[in-house]
Amino acid sequence: MALAGPLFAPATLAADVVDIGFVDQAALSNVRSFTDANRQLAGYKADLDRQFAARMRSVHDQSTQQRIAQEFQNKLAARQRELFGPLFARAQVAIASVASSKNLSVIVDKRIVIVGGQDVTSNVIALLSGPGDPIPPLNTPPPSSVGFVDQAQIDQVPKLKSANDDFQKFQASQQQAAQVKIKGAKTDADRQAVLKDYQAALADKNKQEIAPLVDKTRDAIADVAKKKRLLLVIDRSNLIYGGTDITSDVTNALK
């Protein structure tokens, strides 16, 4: 159940929030340590691809093919963690250090910033490009007026999960029926009509069952935010450092 953009933000946000920084994560990926790791991973994947192709030449049953594919996927994932795990940890320390030095309680992803905030990308890159490891701050993040929720956890609330599951089943059945109709369609106009009906059926189902729950979720987030005097609530995926976790408060309100 997707909730795009800030999940709660009053009109006075730009004037009230002064301790938010943001980082361009795409720029961080161009730091030499990350580009070197990407190059190493690409080389490792190329070797794995050759090994995988050689193994699969003599395998014909599907279960063995799936087992081998999973084996190689696990190898690639393990190498990725080995290469990038320490780099992500180092970047997190650098971000925390910059936030502390600039008295910022929250660092978010640049993608969600429309106006305001302090760009600390260059400061973080400078620390990551230095000869030594960034020094972690002595203090934990201060209390923040920015909250966050973990959408994945909210989606597991029983009535939300049930609605999502029902919608997925409905979508699958409608898609199957539409495919049958398209195969029997004689003209492009007939096929377009089938597609239009399929899209309309999904839109109606979404309006009836999903949209009301999205509204209830937004209302619950807004209520919790007001009680905790938060000026902004974002999804966990857009948060890089700091913030106030209100996920459990929201899930409790929705149960």
Which positions does each model-derived feature cover?
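Amphipathic, charged alpha-helical segments and their helix-to-coil junctions
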Residues: 13-255
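Bacterial N-terminal signal peptides
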Residues: 1-6
